Design a protein with these regions (language model features):
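Short, amphipathic alpha-helical "recognition" segments used to contact nucleic acids or chromatin
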Residues: 33-49
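Short alpha-helical "recognition helix" segments of helix-turn-helix
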Residues: 52-58
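Short Lys/Arg-enriched helix C-cap and helix-to-coil transition segments
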Residues: 76-95
């Protein structure tokens, strides 16, 4: 798993009070599945990895990543959820800066 994906996974697991291992499991509850989808979204949108690259990081197909991103985007219409995702994005951007990773649309691989 790439460094950006690990950062996103750790941030989401911490924010949702879930063990990182739960996000790596093959299946799980809806809450765990959504946490994994959010981590995939942050890896794709925040770090700019392609859907295929994100899929490889999370051992999922690129179409699964596309579906995850669509679900998160749809929920961002809810102000509280959008605020939480924005806070995660900001936190990841600060961490990425400190670790010399690129965070943003242009991303780094």
């Amino acid at each position: 798993m790439s460094a950006p994906a690990r950062l996103a996974e750790a941030a989401v697991s911490g924010a949702m009070s879930l063990p990182v291992g739960a996000l790596r499991a093959g299946r799980g509850t809806r809450r765990i599945a959504f946490a994994r989808q959010l981590a995939m979204y942050l890896t794709h949108v925040g770090f700019g990895l392609t859907l295929t690259e994100v899929g490889a990081c999370f051992e999922r197909d690129r179409t699964t990543v596309r579906h995850a991103c669509a679900l998160v985007e749809d929920r961002r219409d809810q102000p509280a959820f959008d605020f939480a995702v924005s806070a995660l994005e900001t936190g990841l951007a600060h961490l990425a800066f400190g670790l010399q990773l690129r965070f943003g649309r242009e991303g780094s691989r």
